[in-house]
């Protein structure tokens, strides 16, 4: 008798590492908790993923002292049924690893990792990233470079230019960064075993030998790291609310 197979619906999970202290903002609290148009930056980001029907579950990794605070905010903004809070680690890679361990995922499921402080990500870009992961196994959102890119050498007297990198060979990595669960899990396991710490998830996956596709990004999808970034995000929100700008 031939074996019976059951079709399984692919799941999509989002992970938002939010355990950073945000020292460059020089504020009294981590930047993900700062208000953007009266709403915490983290909540803006969580709402964006919650609005995408294909996203099965959302996991946010925060420092242990912030867990109750984040759970209260999630409940206040009506996201408790979509978002789960896990304890983050000492760095981004550890926080993502903790969230990966909590996912009820299988190898072919999709995992999107997004900077908690990119609050203006739009649903269309999230959907395109999911599509790219289904096709390629791994994909990042990337913004084409418009400035001339120089490779430099650091010396005791400052930086010296050693070459010019053609712009067509460069993209500025944004998030979300998406992967098949199995690909990301194996790459993280290898990185942990080797003591490798990447600056983003794609660098860990690249190191494991996996190709990573690029989905077009947007300047609106900015990462809030400095005080001026918060002002720019507020400007973008105002422009979009008035119909003067789109993603």
Question: What are the language-model segments listed below?
Answer:
Residues 2-13, 19, 51, 108, ...:
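SAM-dependent methyltransferases
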Residues 16, 42, 99, 114-115, ...:
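Residue-level signal for inorganic ion chemistry
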Residues 12, 82-83, 170:
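Short, conserved active-site loop motifs that form the nucleotide-linked donor/cofactor pocket
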Residues 14-16, 60, 113, 138-141:
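Structural beta-sheet core signal
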Residues 75-109:
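Short phosphate-binding loop-to-helix
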Residues 9-68:
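N-terminal glycine-rich phosphate-binding loop and ensuing alpha1 helix
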Residues 25, 70-71, 129, 149, ...:
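Hydrophobic packing residues within well-ordered alpha-helices of enzyme cores
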Residues 120-215, 245-247:
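Conserved core of the sugar-phosphate nucleotidyltransferase
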């Amino acid at each position: 008798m031939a074996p019976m197979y059951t079709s399984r619906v692919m799941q999509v999970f989002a992970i938002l590492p939010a355990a950073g202290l945000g020292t460059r903002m020089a504020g009294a609290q981590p930047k993900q908790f700062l208000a953007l148009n009266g709403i915490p930056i983290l909540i803006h980001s969580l709402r964006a993923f919650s609005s995408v029907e294909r996203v099965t579950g959302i996991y946010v990794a925060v420092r242990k002292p912030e867990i109750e605070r984040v759970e209260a905010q999630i409940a206040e903004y009506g996201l408790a049924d979509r978002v789960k809070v896990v304890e983050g680690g000492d760095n981004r890679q550890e926080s993502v690893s903790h969230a990966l361990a909590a996912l009820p995922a299988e190898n072919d499921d999709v995992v999107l990792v997004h900077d908690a402080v990119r609050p203006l990500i739009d649903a269309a870009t999230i959907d395109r990233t999911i599509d790219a992961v289904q096709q390629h196994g791994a994909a990042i959102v990337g913004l084409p470079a418009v400035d001339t890119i120089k490779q430099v050498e650091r010396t005791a007297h400052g930086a010296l230019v050693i070459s010019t990198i053609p712009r067509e060979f460069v993209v500025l990595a944004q998030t979300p960064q998406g992967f098949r669960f199995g690909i990301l899990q194996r790459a993280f396991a290898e990185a942990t075993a080797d003591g490798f710490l990447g600056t983003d998830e794609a660098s860990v996956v690249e190191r494991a030998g996996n190709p990573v596709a690029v989905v077009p990004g947007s300047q609106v999808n900015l990462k809030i790291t400095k005080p001026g970034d918060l002002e720019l995000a507020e400007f973008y929100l105002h422009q979009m609310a008035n119909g003067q700008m789109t993603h």
